Amino acid sequence: MKSIFNIKNFINFLIKSNVYVAMSVCSLMISVCIILGLKIHFFATGILFFGTIISYYFTKQGNFIIRSTSLILCVLFCFFCFFNLQWKSQIIIILNSILSIFYILPIRKKNLRSIAFVKIFIVAFCWILGSVWLPIFEDNYLINKYVYWISLQYFIWVIVLILPFDIRDKKYDTLKIITFPTKFGVIFTKILGFILVLLFLTISYFINKNSIWYSQFISGIITALFLYFSKEQQSKYYCNFWVESVPIFYLILLILLQ
């Protein structure tokens, strides 16, 4: 019983500290490095990991007040990483930071998060900038059609991964944030998600070799199942742990099937 309790506490720490979501984002980035044959650069990975922790911390708070020493260390490390990146990678980080700031801070009493349907696309776009374009620019990879296809594919996938969170938050978002569940209902949201999963898998089938296709097919089906079983009343671990686990599981599959 004690070991189970300790595991639960550890999982709670990973979730509350935003370490787990950072692991999820970095898993997508490493998957891109594997697929494209890129080097996994220390500074790019470091700034993505700790930058995600910082971004989600400020989003939860709704302001930019730093209340812990550990977060100050994260910020300092991110600055250190930033000045060791390629200039194109720095532009990605700056763009992501600007979007994160306006996602949180209101302009004329509104932030990007409060604009109808914008929330999900901003989050997905930031994930793709960090997980796809950051490692590509840092490794000076030649941009080709495949890069655009995988960007679109991952963008679609991340949108579907966000939908269970929007379903969970429907009762909180109704009065202040317009999302697909609050505007069109849970059933419509799930149907939309299934269509997007199908699109994600279709793109994968035509652009990827077998090992990547198998990894993405399994991960896509798991994503669809998590969406199917999503509801407004759910365990606190359903989205924050299990849904966030999908990119991590995908990376493991990708490594095993190479």
Tell where the protein language model's regions lie, with residue ranges:
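Interhelical loop and helix-boundary elements at the membrane-water interface
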Residues: K2-M23, Q61-L71, I104-F125, T179, ...
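Short juxtamembrane and helix-loop transition motifs at transmembrane-helix boundaries
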Residues: I4-I11, Y56-G62, F79-W87, K110-R113, ...
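Catalytic cores of Mg2+-dependent Asp-rich isoprenoid enzymes
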Residues: N6-F49, I53, K190-L201, N208-Q258
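Helix-coil boundary and interhelical linker segments in multi-pass alpha-helical membrane proteins
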Residues: S27-G46, C78-I91, S131-L152, I203-W213, ...
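Solvent-exposed interhelical
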Residues: L48-L73, F155-V197
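Transmembrane alpha-helical segments that form the membrane-embedded catalytic/substrate-channel core
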Residues: F50-Q61, L95-K109, L129, Y154-K170, ...
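Intramembrane alpha-helical segments
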Residues: I65-E138, F226-L227
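Functional transmembrane core segments of multi-pass inner-membrane proteins
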Residues: I120-K170
